[in-house]
Amino acid sequence: MIENDKKKNIVRVIEALIFASTKPVSAKELSPYLEGFELNDIIEIIEKRYSSDSGVQLQKISSDHFAFRTHPDIAARLNLERAVERPLSRVAMEVLAIIAYHQPITRSEIEEIRGISLSRGTIDILLEHDWIKPRGRRRTPGRPLTWGTTINFLDYFGLSELDDLPG
């Protein structure tokens, strides 16, 4: 009985942590609160709680991040006021797509694919949005920096994993 109460409390804590976060929460961030329980078991309980009769659902992003999102069947009925974001330039979207499909990729490889040089500002804009991040260095002469997408990229574009990209 005590173990069951403890598990219920852990479920509530994990649920609150995910709910209160503005960004997807990683399994690593949740693990200190599990007190010996399995995260998958806790997540399963939360998913059942937010089944089809709820306005929100727990979404798994990538393989180990979680976020609450509006249930798809009512999303169209909601009209939320948001700060208007300036749309990305065509070049920035093109570079983001190249990074998403070819990651990890170096700046020179991006330029080779595009056939034109890449301005530092384009990378800066994608970094500001937290859609890309450095992924390490190639073991080639000059040790160029490689780029890849982030969890926030997946979240913003409604993807669970990179395999969900079209094409």
Predicted regions and their residues:
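Transcription-machinery-associated regions
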Residues: 123-129, 133-139, 146, 153-167
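Short alpha-helical segments that sit at the start of domains
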Residues: 1-14, 67-93
